[in-house]
Amino acid sequence: MVKKNFIPSVSLVRRDLPTLVTTTTSSTALSKPTSSVVSETSSKSLPSLTSSAFSTSSGATSSSSLIVASITPPSTAGNPFILNAADKPNGTVYIAVGAVIGAIFISILIWWLVSSYLSRRFTMTNSYANDSKNLYRGHHKHSSSLQSNPFDINDEKSYMQDDWDSMSQLESSQYEDAASPFNPIQDPFTDSRRSLFISPTLQVSQYEKSHSRHQSKDTNIFIDDPSLYVGTYLEEEEEEERKLNLNRPQRAASPERKEKKINSMEGYHKRNQSSLGLIPVASATSNTSSPKKAHKRQAPSMFLDDVLNGREII
């Protein structure tokens, strides 16, 4: 491709004309008449001319040519290394990146919604389970733990604690004749003792018997209604043992103190040297002491082990 440029030329000319001197010499030949030669010299000076004019030459033209190459990309037909983007929209890369970022944000939002829903559902389930376990009380309004007044909850807890305290006091009232909880092997009649005689075997046996008796009382308490059941079990045998322990033993170091467990009436007759009513009491004591005589064949250590384990009662 040839491109022609026409550039107009503008020139500024200033010049002076040179001074011209002309000398003319003429000679005339004399003819017959006499003539004089006239020599004429003339000097003529031309005026100086100054001309300043802008002249535009329309006829003078200058031409220049510039060659520009055209770039043609290769064809994508059948070329696996060139992406054919003719059928793709503009900004495909930006669309793909935006889609990935949006998917990440949507997944985070879904995870938050699911976790909050599961947490609320678990909390509601636990609160309903706890509310169903609580006992209904007339002065308390039964409502969910999520909607109830915290002051009402504290009042209900204190009321339940008072109920448990009353239950513990009811149970402890059944054990008024028991040993001290700080010392499991303790004689319950230490304060009222009038003798210096101490029998560890007798104390252990008394503790085992009282413990078994209290266990039976516990089963009876839990079987019956604790709010209506109030009572103490004072058996005749316990009263006799209590009266017997208050008495001074006849022989302080007697090896037969295991067989000194007799009826209170018999001890009364012995102290007062009375034989009234001894025959039926003796028959009763002989019947009760008959199985104990079989233990005379055992070693003392074996008998003590049986007493400690609760298999034997002194």
UniProtKB/Swiss-Prot annotation:
An example Gene Ontology CC term for this record: vacuolar membrane
InterPro entries: PRM (IPR051009)
Primary location: membrane
Skewed-composition ranges (Basic and acidic residues): 254-269
Region annotated Disordered, chain positions: 32-60, 240-309
Membrane-protein topology: Single-pass membrane protein
Superkingdom assignment: Eukaryota
Membrane spanning residue stretches: 93-113
Keyword Transit peptide: no
Keywords: Membrane, Phosphoprotein, Transmembrane, Transmembrane helix, Vacuole
Localization (cell): Vacuole membrane
Modification Phosphoserine, positions: S148, S254, S274
PANTHER family per the UniProt record, alphabetical: CHITIN SYNTHASE 3 COMPLEX PROTEIN CSI2-RELATED
Similarity comment: Belongs to the PRM5 family.
Name of this chain's protein: Vacuolar membrane protein EC1118_1N9_3125g
Organism: Saccharomyces cerevisiae (strain Lalvin EC1118 / Prise de mousse) (Baker's yeast)
